[in-house]
Amino acid sequence: MREQSSYKDAGVDIDKANLFISRIIPLIKMTSRKEVMKGIGGFGGLFHLDLKKIKDPVLVAATDGVGTKIKIAQMMNKHDTVGIDLVAMSVNDIIVQGAEPIFFLDYIAIGQMDVERNVKLIEGIVKGCQEAGCALIGGETAEMPGIYSENEYDLAGFCIGVVENGRIIDGSDIRVGDRVIGIASNGIHSNGYSLVRKVIFDKAKLNVDDTIEGIENSIGEELLRPTRIYVKPVLNLMKSFNIKGIVHITGGGFVDNIPRIVPNQCCTVIRMNSWQIPPIFSIIQELGDIDQMEMVRVFNMGIGMILIVSEKETDDIVERLNMLGEKAYIIGSIEKADGEKSAVSFT
């Protein structure tokens, strides 16, 4: 008699997948908005855009992942925060356009179904969606033995936001004399981890459980600090102030991200002594013998989001941000570009 084959024998356990879905449905409901028309389980998520609130809507889409920060989560066997990172990376990209994130979808690629671990991943995604005020309306968990090893996984997120046409923030109103406000990050966030891992684990031979002078947590805990979500404070600001430009400091740091929003006839001057750079960055720089320009091109250096505003509104905006629980600093200004200056310069 020939031996029968099954999907489970091939490494894909449908029963475990169904158990996972049953576990996460109550979590996902915690992110629901009134515009969500149907619960999880359909072939696609349904979201009814309310045209009474917004008359000429423009949809804004963003997608991102968490990068090799996932390796730290796997080393720590701590999986409840990288979901926050996943949401943050996309919703922060949405808000810089002046758009409100309204719904989110996730994609989890795994080698083998680990229900408890995957529930932790969704718990983080749910928390991130709650912080951003957007609904988790769908997702995909792809079990792919042979592509990923048993304990490996990867994450991708997709977010849609909406903004009134005519209120899109695109940097076109930025002028010489405008001020640059930096909002504090929560550590490294989700970029630069390939360099971080090379320096800390390969070069310095440290472990996730080790401690370093100047940092209260273990190395692993410090590196897993979740990316800060700036949606609610920025939405609050947009109701009262003219925010001319917003920059999410992600891959490319200050050097590559600021020019994406500042007009070519302007340059941005950043004063590096205007805020306290968290110790983790100086530790990485020292252990890795990393050049300062490389640091500001790879890492956020303690500033997760930048606002460009008129001089007259600067102090009031900083005061509002502090009132909202954000640490905000005036970190620079917009100057006239010339042939000798870089698009972003540091003093």
Curated annotation (Swiss-Prot):
The keyword Oxidoreductase does not apply. The gene is purM. It comes from the Bacteria. This is Phosphoribosylformylglycinamidine cyclo-ligase. Keywords: ATP-binding, Cytoplasm, Ligase, Nucleotide-binding, Purine biosynthesis. It is found in: Cytoplasm. One of its GO terms (biological process) is adenine biosynthetic process. Pfam families: AIRS, AIRS_C. Pathway: Purine metabolism; IMP biosynthesis via de novo pathway; 5-amino-1-(5-phospho-D-ribosyl)imidazole from N(2)-formyl-N(1)-(5-phospho-D-ribosyl)glycinamide: step 2/2. It catalyses: 2-formamido-N(1)-(5-O-phospho-beta-D-ribosyl)acetamidine + ATP = 5-amino-1-(5-phospho-beta-D-ribosyl)imidazole + ADP + phosphate + H(+). InterPro entries: PurM-like_C_dom, PurM-like_C_sf, PurM-like_N, PurM-like_N_sf, PurM_cligase. One of its GO terms (molecular function) is phosphoribosylamine-glycine ligase activity. PANTHER family: TRIFUNCTIONAL PURINE BIOSYNTHETIC PROTEIN ADENOSINE-3, TRIFUNCTIONAL PURINE BIOSYNTHETIC PROTEIN ADENOSINE-3-RELATED. Belongs to the AIR synthase family. Its EC number is 6.3.3.1. It is an enzyme of class 6 (ligase). GO terms for cellular component: cytosol. It comes from Syntrophus aciditrophicus (strain SB).
